[in-house]
Design a protein with these regions (language model features):
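Conserved acetyl-CoA pyrophosphate-binding loop and the N-cap/start of the following alpha-helix
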Residues: 97-109
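Conserved beta-strand in the GNAT
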Residues: 56, 62-71, 87, 92
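Conserved GNAT-fold acetyl-CoA-binding loop/helix
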Residues: 23-43
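A short helix-loop-beta-strand connector motif used in the catalytic cores of GNAT acetyltransferases and
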Residues: 44-56, 87
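A conserved beta-turn-beta hairpin within the catalytic core of GNAT-like acetyltransferases
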Residues: 73-88, 98
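Conserved beta-strand-loop-alpha-helix junction that forms the acyl-donor binding cleft
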Residues: 122-132, 147-150
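A short beta-loop-alpha structural element at the N-terminal edge
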Residues: 3-17
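Conserved GNAT acetyl-CoA-binding A-motif
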Residues: 107, 114-126
Length: 150
């Protein structure tokens, strides 16, 4: 039976295993790829103490999907009076479970929880494969953002 739930700190091992699996798949890495201590340490710290929500999807005891929402608090503006914004990240469903509405349900759960937390905007970086899902949920392209990377 498929179970959807918002993860808690008690789920840290499931969160970490799903995160590392997602990173391997998305980046085309082998199953035995060893991540840097920094990535593992910082991911664990973020799941335990970061301002985030993650949905886990389980089939029995096995994680088959995950999606995270990261929250930011910036100076309030007229269009964002709470200053609360969010960024949707790492929406992942195992290959054999795709095209069953799992990603949609995870994202809908996170959207509902995000509005309930007072956020006024959700951003995301869409892959080509994910774009139709996000558009069907009402996401639009934005020209507001510029990025400076180190």
């Amino acid at each position: 039976m498929i179970e959807y739930r918002i993860a808690t700190n008690d789920d840290i091992e499931l969160l970490m295993s799903s995160r590392l699996e997602m990173l391997r798949v998305v980046n085309g890495l082998s199953n035995d790829y060893v991540f840097s201590d920094e990535i593992v340490r910082e991911s664990r710290e973020y799941f335990l103490h970061g301002d985030q929500l993650t949905v886990l999807v389980l089939d029995g005891s096995e994680v088959i999907g995950c999606a995270s929402m990261s929250f930011m608090w910036i100076m309030p503006t007229f269009s964002h009076p709470t200053g609360r914004r969010a960024h949707l990240m790492n929406v992942y469903t195992r290959n054999e479970y795709r095209r069953q509405g799992i990603a949609r349900k995870m994202v809908e759960m996170l959207i509902d929880a995000t509005w309930a937390k007072g956020a006024t905007e959700i951003s995301l970086d869409a892959t080509v494969m994910g774009r139709p899902l996000y558009e069907s949920l009402g996401f639009k392209n934005s020209t507001e953002c510029m990025v400076l990377a180190k």
